[in-house]
Amino acid sequence: MVYFGKTLNRDNMEDSVKMSDIDGLGMKPANLDWANMGFGYVATRSHVRMTWMDGRWSEPELINEPYIKMSIAATCLHYGQEAFEGLKAFRCKDGKVRVFRPWENIRRMNNTADYILMPQVPEELYLKCIQMVVRDNQDYVPPYGTGGSLYIRPLLIGTGAQIGVSPAKMFDFIILVTPVGAYYKGGLTPVEALVITDFDRAAPRGTGHIKVGGNYAASLLPSKKAKEQHYPITLFLDPETHTYIDEFGTSNFFAINKDN
């Protein structure tokens, strides 16, 4: 429940300071401009959360507050023991809401979890969590024909306290959702990319092949430099030889080398 009183446990905010002014809360689906949505965060009704401890997952719960309470010594904060995914739900022409290829994202996250010593989320339980949060926020799925979607962000984080460099003993699995428009407003309009030659997008024998936040934090500086030169996206080369195309900063690279 979102509470607007004095005892918020958020530095005792005054009554005159609304949480909606700070966190983007309070936006109702009826007030959203579906035709002009960007790709940003809009707080929705709920997220789903469950905790792993003593070798098992708790039952998933729908939570209304968009905050996490954890130890200041949590491994996700100190050592980057976290993984995330991104997938979408679309409202189709028949009015039904469908999630695109969830199994692929589930398997990729579990592959990441194995690599950085986090517990896997069983596939059926993972899917149940997706269904719960999408169903509870289905009025935030943009209408068919607007080009928008409900972005689904699963997050697996080490929340157990650990000062030494070792795996946590407690983890949280969270899925938040937010309505978004197209990532590129121009649609299929071509854009120019800056080829990055002095920075590696992914460490070939590190975490480059899995989806962890550190990979993205490391790309913020070259992305900033590209935008300063008026390039909306970056194109990275392979980290071993710097002679082959690797990927864009925001997506994979596909090339058409023959016109049929």
Question: Where are these predicted regions, by residue range?
Answer:
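Intrinsically disordered, low-complexity linker/loop segments enriched in Gly/Pro
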Residues: 136, 158-159
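Extended, Lys/Arg-enriched charged tracts that mediate electrostatic binding to polyanionic substrates
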Residues: 142-153, 157
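Compact soluble domain cores
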Residues: 125, 138-139
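Helix-start/capping segments and mature chain N-termini
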Residues: 2-129, 133, 162-260
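Short, charge-rich binding segments
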Residues: 140-145, 165-167
